[in-house]
């Protein structure tokens, strides 16, 4: 089955049938459920879909200030690992996509339930990759300094162009959020090397702050990590630049 076949077209753009008599109703039927919704990267995606008018729900192990904020913004969040806690509106595989973080174990009860019932299940990095299609992507990678640098890029973009969006790996003091939504195609993204997530991005501008030995539980050797960064640089779009 093609990834996001019921929601995205081949360019990764939102599929909303133009001949539908009720386009808004159809749009609202696209629900997103997050496993690990309280994570800094996951919550930014959740906020994006809330802004888009989607129904959003999810699970996290621990209630936090961030999950409280997401709930206040409209998400339904629970903290008990139990498929019975999944809201009824998110129990239909025809209308719900499940996004999970690599931190969620393979034997997680809710993840197993979604798999057993035929849901479309994608990693956070996959969803971010799809959402970045059609954008001018400024991706910041590196074993240290990603969040600070991405926030600087987002702030400069905002101040210079008056627009642009960003998915941040921290709560920016300037924006008071980990999500920035603005006009135009420019998108600043924190490109995480953990689990090779950044290889889901095809940037126009790629920034690498550092490539020190890290996440060796994933890569095995420092050389393998450096090779992944080289692959990331190799995915720069034609006419793009690396910094």
Give the positions of each predicted feature.
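Phosphate-binding loop of NTP-binding sites
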Residues: 14, 24-25, 48, 71, ...
